[in-house]
A protein has these predicted regions:
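Substrate/cofactor-recognition hotspot
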Residues: 1-244
């Protein structure tokens, strides 16, 4: 086998967990030899393939494949748990894949096989800024009590990235959404939710009592929302995520 063929055979083995079929091996070899695609793009073809997706790997197993394929080693526990944490907080597998493919290690692997590494272009809004993505996922979890759906996540990330929404406006979009309203929260539960979203903690007894009283005395939920959303605590949360 030529070095390019060996590179492809390695992808079949590591990513698809099987031997290369003749026609597949020929087709991918052609693509690389002709310079039509880089090592990164061919790897993307394998990682994004229907066959790989059908393996339905857990995040942990997915990362093991990336470590073996692109870093040529077993995962170290510190590195792996950092990536697991990223995935758990809404960073997409595509974004993590890009991190592995654009590593020094994979650059080395490609040059070993005489291949140009190249880069990966991520086009979805949720893949443009990991911190913005994490902020939006946090809103889904704390306000709506669920994980983000892909189109919603892309929509909110886009609104924040393009400056169409500030962090406060995005949070308002969740708190005053039909989905949130359908939860029919009592004043107490409403205030508890605001503490989690804007203070990053559970409500303390005195604070909870004071805010519930404000509502009982006829103030609107919007008024209370503003009190939380304009707080120093929420500003600090936004700073942490690098958003305004």
């Amino acid at each position: 086998y030529t070095s390019v063929q060996q590179f492809i055979i390695r992808l079949y083995k590591n990513v698809l967990n099987r031997d290369a079929d003749v026609s597949g091996l020929d087709a991918w070899t052609q693509v690389l030899v002709s310079g039509r695609e880089s090592g990164a793009k061919v790897s993307e073809g394998f990682i994004y393939s229907k066959e790989f997706k059908e393996r339905q790997l857990s995040d942990s197993d997915y990362l093991d494949v990336l470590y073996h394929t692109f870093l040529n080693r077993d995962a170290d526990s510190a590195g792996k748990s950092e990536w697991m944490n990223q995935l758990a907080n809404g960073v997409s597998r595509n974004s993590v894949f890009k991190g592995f493919v654009e590593s020094d290690e994979f650059t080395g692997i490609c040059s070993q096989y005489g291949i140009i590494r190249g880069n990966i272009q991520l086009t979805e809004p949720r893949d443009q800024n990991d911190n913005v993505t994490k902020f939006v996922v946090r809103c889904y979890r704390l306000c709506l009590g669920r994980d983000a759906d892909e189109s919603g996540l892309n929509g909110w990330c886009n609104a924040i990235l393009t400056g169409q929404n500030t962090a406060k406006e995005a949070a308002a979009g969740f708190v005053f959404s039909d989905e949130f309203k359908k939860k029919n929260l009592s004043d107490t539960e409403y205030v508890k939710t605001l503490y989690r979203v804007f203070m990053d903690r559970e409500a303390d007894g005195a604070g909870l009592e004071a805010w519930v009283k404000v509502l009982k005395n006829g103030q609107t939920r919007e008024h209370v929302f503003n009190g939380f959303a304009d707080s120093n605590e929420f500003r600090e949360i936004c700073t942490r995520y690098g958003i305004k």
